[in-house]
Amino acid sequence: MCIPSNRRSAIAIEAPVLIVADINTLWRSCPFQALSGLRPVLGLAPMDPLIAMRHRRLPWGAKRGTQQKMTVLSIVLPFGWATRRAAEVLPRLWTAALKECRSVGADPSALVVTSPHYAPLVRDLSSEFPICYYCSDDYMNYAEWNSNEMRQQESVVVQNAKHSFFVSEALRDRAVKEYAIDPARGSVSMNATGEEFLAPVSDLEIDRLLSRFRKLTRPIAGVIGGISDRLDFDLIEKVAESDAVGSVLLVGPVAAGFKDARLDTLRRNPKCIFAGEQAHDALRVWLQAVDVVLIPFRSCHFNTMCSPMRLFDHLAAGRPIVATDACPQVREFQDCVMIASTDEEFLEKVKEVLSAPADSTYLELMRKRAREHTWAARALTLNSRIDAELEKAACKADSLQ
């Protein structure tokens, strides 16, 4: 279903529409943008009035747009729509979604929810409508969210969903254990990369980019992605102190409200260059501009559970990758990612990479692995599983008639 912004489609669409609530983060949006190439998808983007104004739109009403072939319906809801007022307000979101589908002559086929906050909606709809869960994060360990409430709400979602997709084995295994579901009702769908990250970047583009940062000196070690307490800043400092490294380039936003004295130390280090937040699709140039890419995750619960998008973008860029062993999913790619279990080993691997040109066979293996893990590839699996669940639901409905 593809509708130009603020206009209704001139052609009625008869194919059933998959509704996704919500697509408010990149890692929730990307899989369903890709899926929209295979089936009609309506992505919901609810927000409160303050967020709406930050997006430079009116703090009320609904607005229609597109992301690739996915129709996006952003709708302003009252403050507390996802928390204290969820049971009251979320039915409005569902009503708006149904209205949007029917405005183009289509019926909804299923609902995919992407966070435990939608538990009230799942509870209301699950007996009469197919629902799936797409879990892209360890919501119980979000610092700003109530862990017990998240566990209770996620239990409702997982137990009522026809199928749940988890971005890591750790998240899937925990759900099977804690919510006592049949393992067949949960599968792993890791994060991925866009095919645009596989495209080579010209020397001219790289030179133009690096010219903005005159203090950069090769060899360049890059830390590309969000900057938060998931990173080992002491290890990054040691990399910067290494004689094998000319500069450490950090590209990405600092997490809101995050402060750390060790990060401040990095900012004062003349060998560390901070480029700030960049558009995600622009990161492919940054990635191909560096000589080695680092994934310096520290040992923590969140890294144990996660599926780092940066891993897949890094693979697509075809630059050598050195990572700590803090994330089990990163370790699954040890055939093309150099994994270190100690700081000393990490530094030695960085030095090893920078001391000699990367083997072409190794770089091609990285790109091969990246091609296996694109969002388009993920969409094929998601589509197949959703179709299977819809077919089972239809057969069950027929048997009851």
Where are these regions (language model features)?
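Conserved acidic donor-binding segment of nucleotide-sugar-dependent glycosyltransferases
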Residues: 336-344, 351-358
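Acidic anion/phosphate-binding donor-loop and adjacent secondary structure
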Residues: 141-147, 176, 193-212, 217, ...
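A charged, aromatic-enriched C-terminal amphipathic alpha-helix characteristic of glycosyltransferases
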Residues: 357-391
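Conserved donor-binding/catalytic core segment of Leloir-type glycosyltransferases
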Residues: 210-231, 236-237, 248-251, 371
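Nucleotide-sugar-dependent
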Residues: 281-286, 293-315, 323-332
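Membrane-proximal helix-turn-helix segments that form the acceptor-binding/catalytic region
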Residues: 98-102, 146-167
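Nucleotide-activated donor-binding/catalytic signature segment of Leloir-type glycosyltransferases, i.e.
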Residues: 252, 260-285
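Carbohydrate-associated surface elements
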Residues: 170, 189-192
